[in-house]
A protein has these predicted regions:
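Transmembrane alpha-helices of multi-pass small-molecule transport proteins
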Residues: 42-93, 123-127, 180-184, 201-219, ...
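Glycine-/small-residue-enriched transmembrane alpha-helix faces in small-molecule transporters
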Residues: 1-54, 163-190, 233-234, 239, ...
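Specific alpha-helical transmembrane segments that line the substrate/conduction pathway
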Residues: 51-54, 58, 62, 93, ...
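Loop-to-transmembrane alpha-helix entry segments
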Residues: 117, 133-154, 164-170, 228, ...
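C-terminal-most transmembrane helix of multi-pass membrane proteins
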Residues: 2-8, 57, 156-158, 230, ...
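Specific transmembrane alpha-helical segments of multi-pass solute transporters/efflux pumps
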Residues: 69-113, 117, 154, 237-255
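Juxtamembrane C-cap of transmembrane helices in multi-pass membrane transport proteins
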Residues: 24-44, 59, 98-108, 116, ...
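Transmembrane alpha-helical segments that form core, pore/gating elements
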Residues: 22, 33, 64-65, 124-126, ...
Length: 312
């Protein structure tokens, strides 16, 4: 256990695993769009998108629990303790974050949505330092957050304009989703020290996925044309969620929130670059703006973690 702790707290290992998570999440964006097209889910059909997300997360949770059971060579059934911790995490992360996010995205521009989403990592670090107070806010952490968020702004404003309008169901709901993300990050950081982060992740995904599916169906959502390719896409997205969020939870179990959350600023960069490559929009990803954004984010990550790097 000590060796595991030492390994998972090394800055290089944290950086590698966190970036793997961000690459997986980034690859999900173009795949989700492909899934919408194949299953005839309209861009403005929020209810059907929530059904799609619900099925994805339910399957992701089941996959995590199945793989964990195979690894432990016994069937892992969540007990009362796991359920006690999984319910608040699921309400904050899978249900709260994604319910408000999907509705918000449908009522605002992609530019503003991307920028506000970038605030989630900033909010998580602020909550850890100022509200929960399980770590100390320093000028280094603040500077790293500002630089990381600046990188998100740059990557989202490339060749685009930004209006300053604000609506509750648009920008407001996306902001609420990021507050929910911040809360879930803190909860995972605390609860993963008490129970298995893998079982916690699988349980909360399964519960949250079922709730999202029922909410989407209740709103009139449905998946139209279900094909073999569509099923493969849902399985892939479920694997992305299962692997990425479980890795993220394990990292949060062994490290300060700020040390892990700062890598979340890499996520928008991965989304833009991978979407551009897969969708054939190479010029959009590889230009001066994306390089500046990458430099800002990497500098922010270094500033937050450089002390830890010296210790390790």
């Amino acid at each position: 256990m000590v060796q595991k702790k030492n390994t998972l707290t090394k800055t290089g290992i944290v950086a590698l695993l966190a970036c793997v998570c961000c690459i997986l999440w980034g690859s999900a964006i173009p795949v989700i769009k492909t899934g919408y097209r194949l299953m005839e889910v309209d861009a403005a059909d929020t209810a059907s998108q929530i059904v799609f997300a619900g099925i994805r997360f339910t399957l992701a949770g089941l996959l995590v629990l199945i793989f964990a059971s195979i690894r432990e060579r016994k069937v892992l059934i969540p007990d009362r303790t796991i359920l006690k911790y999984a319910v608040p995490v699921c309400l904050a992360q899978t249900v709260g974050q994604y319910f408000f996010f999907y509705i918000g995205v449908a009522h605002t521009s992609g530019v503003k949505g991307g920028i506000i989403t970038g605030l989630g990592n900033f909010i998580a670090i602020l909550m850890a330092c100022l509200i929960v107070r399980n770590e100390r806010m320093t000028g280094r952490k603040m500077a790293g957050c500002v630089l990381g968020f600046a990188g998100v702004v740059v990557i989202n404003l490339m060749g685009k304009s930004l209006d300053i309008g604000f609506t509750l169901t648009g920008e407001g709901f996306i902001l609420i989703s990021q507050v929910a993300y911040g809360i879930s990050t803190i909860l995972i950081n605390i609860y993963s020290k008490k129970v298995s982060p893998v079982v916690l992740s699988g349980t909360q995904f399964t519960m949250g996925g079922v709730v999202l599916t029922l909410i989407g169906i209740g709103m009139g959502g449905r998946l139209g044309n279900i094909t073999a390719v569509g099923v493969v896409i849902i399985f892939y997205l479920a694997m992305v969620s299962a692997v990425a969020y479980t890795l993220w939870s394990v990292l949060l179990a062994w490290n300060d929130v700020s040390k892990v959350a700062i890598f979340g600023f890499v996520n928008p960069l991965c989304s833009v670059i991978l979407s551009a490559l897969i969708l054939g929009e190479v010029k959009q990803a590889f230009n001066t703006g994306s390089l500046v954004a990458l430099l800002l984010v990497c500098t922010g990550i270094y500033i937050v973690n450089c002390k830890a790097k010296q210790k390790n």
